[in-house]
Amino acid sequence: MKNPMMTTLLAGGLVACASQPTPPTESATMPSTRDASSTVAVEAATANPLLGLSTLPYHYPPFDRFRNEHFMPAFEIGMAEGRAEIERIAANPAAPTFDNTIVAMERSGQTLGRVSAVFFNLTSAHTNDELDRIDADVSPKLSAYNDAIVLDARLFGRVRALYEQRATLGLDAESQRLLERYYVNFIRAGAQLSDADKDKLKAYNEQLAKLTTQFQQNVLKETNDSAVVVDTRAELDGLDDSAIAAAAAAAKAKGLDGKFILKLQNTSGQPALAVLKNRALRERLYKASIERGNRGNDADNKPVVAAIVQVRADRARLLGYPSHAAYQLEDTTAKTTAAVNKLLGQLAAPAVGNARREAADMQKIIDAQRGGFKLAAWDWAYYAEAVRKQRYDLDESEIKPYFELRSVLENGVFYAAHELYGLSFSERTDLPKYHPDIRTFEVFHDGKALGIFIFDPFKRDSKRGGAWMNSYVDQSALFGYKPVVANHLNITKPADGQPVLLTSDEVQTTFHEFGHALHGLFSNVRYPLFSGTSVPRDFVEYPSQANEMWATWPKVLANYAKHYQTGEPMPLALVAKIQAAEKFNQGFATTEYLSASLLDQVWHQLSPEQARVSDVAAFEQRALANAGVDYAPVPPRYRTTYFSHTFSGGYSAGYYSYIWSEVLVADTDNWFKENGGLKRENGDWYRERLLSRGGSVEAMQLYRDFRGRDPIIEPLLERRGLTPAASR
């Protein structure tokens, strides 16, 4: 399990589509200390399954034994143990050594790390009201726990002394990097501040821990409460029978027999918008989506956003940075706001230009059908499908019967991993589950046990939106741990007896998230700090996006894209259509993404004075206009009030990471094609030089070790249809 304190120092939050949920790190103020020897703690220690290392294979969590009442006592005991361990290190009368200081800190906090891994993963994947209350209570306490460590002058003095003599310590490369990371992370966490400023920092961190927790809980509540109730089946014309049955089941579960409920996904756009023929219902669904957190109710996120932005800006200045974005980006591969602004600005104008051309094509169809209206945001997905049908003779309903979930996973995702890396998978039905829908697999590399993979595919009210990977057990040679990782999706579960048929986007997401899982499974490092996805935010999305290329690789596609009823492979003519349409609608896709990325940057590049925003909605509109991406038919992928990535998910000033990583991905795609594609020797090269090394080597050096040079941007421009030749 990753040491939660050092996870904080390295990453500072949840990776929304990537790695382990970690204790909130934007918090502080010391909680009242409860001694682990108290009556409650002693009783909990004798019966609490969170307090001991799991005896299941790979230390897999005993989900069937966990109860809500176990968590708070386990957190209290874990923090008490961790404080005692850190106190022994800080007060050690012996001169600091790498082992008695740095390695000792890596070994500390095991109980707390174990509790945190389970708890924060469950609050994302399968929460309830009691877990939410515990989350709100424990988040500021954990932040205070972290602050007490990183702001301890004695501890930092030992780290600094070692850092200053690092050239004489005879450390190997990974140990040298570990020492350097500890030193830098302590400084970034405020270790060099005065005592008075440390107190201010703790107060800021405590505020942020509470605010970011509140933001995410509001998003989940609003997403559930904003689901659209439909009175008649006729209004759902265009949805397939499986989707209609799922909508009926959702309504029945809410006591609305005879009606239908369209649940919302986390993005502004909703899948049903592509097929619903009823324009009024499309408008209702779209507006329900984009007004989340903006309805003036008790879950309105506008005041929460304003407070988060202000406190982050104030904290950045206290730490010596002009803005929160400047602080965050210093520890990434981008390094500066100027570099990020340059990339986003370089892409914005051509992306919007492509989107306008795409809109013109759709308007022609509307006019030809005598629609009598101008294309609106709720029309885009529907008429994009019409254009795709017209231009490529292709529509989603023709594709979905070939994308059955089990086949996509086992004959697609797992097959590609076998061909590239020699992986094999054995389902473990004997291991406990936190929800009946999950599947658990033991993973083998050339027949040798590698780790555990948990697959949690379906949307439910207890699960946050989106898709992500997390870790329950991080690989570490220091502890002898093998990884236990999980992928979470939000696929709508069909009615009983109906097949689970995926959209093209859902297939891509399944491959994407498994790219993160591979990053965790292949980790081969000594220290927990460097395990798996413990890399900069703008690098962590690289392995996941790179894995997407195999979804449409001919040999892989032929192995999994088979009709769910007949078993017949997807016809070659249909495959050719899919390949021909790969760049279709890229103007929209790039613009909606860039709009959200630019919003994230504008919010977080504010100085403390500029951050005093009174009207969140007006600020958002001005920001989009100033960036040249305020094109009404293409809303941001996330509007501010439900932008969990940046206001609660660890991607603050970091949502640009997807397009930044895609520069590497497009270049990597070319490398595989140049070297024969889906071959074991290619997979081994990529695994050994990049996937297995986690954060133990500087991120761009890993890329150079793999590719032999720095990345170039031209493949991305071609891939996104942003060059003249590729724009149509």
Pin down the residues of each PLM region.
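Bacterial N-terminal signal peptides that target proteins for export
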Residues: 1-6
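C-terminal motif of bacterial Sec signal peptides marking the signal peptidase cleavage site
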Residues: 15-16
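N-terminal helix-rich structural modules
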Residues: 26-241, 672, 728
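C-terminal, non-catalytic "cap/extension" segments appended to globular domains
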Residues: 32-67, 77, 237, 246, ...
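Short His/Asp/Glu-rich catalytic/ion-coordination signatures at enzyme active sites or charged loops
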Residues: 55-70, 119-138, 161-203, 263-303, ...
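Intrinsically disordered or highly flexible coil/loop and linker segments, enriched in small
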Residues: 80, 84, 88-95, 111-128, ...
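Active-site-proximal, well-structured secondary-structure segments within enzyme catalytic domains
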Residues: 174, 178, 210, 217, ...
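Short pre-active-site segment immediately N-terminal to the catalytic Zn-binding motif
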Residues: 492-511
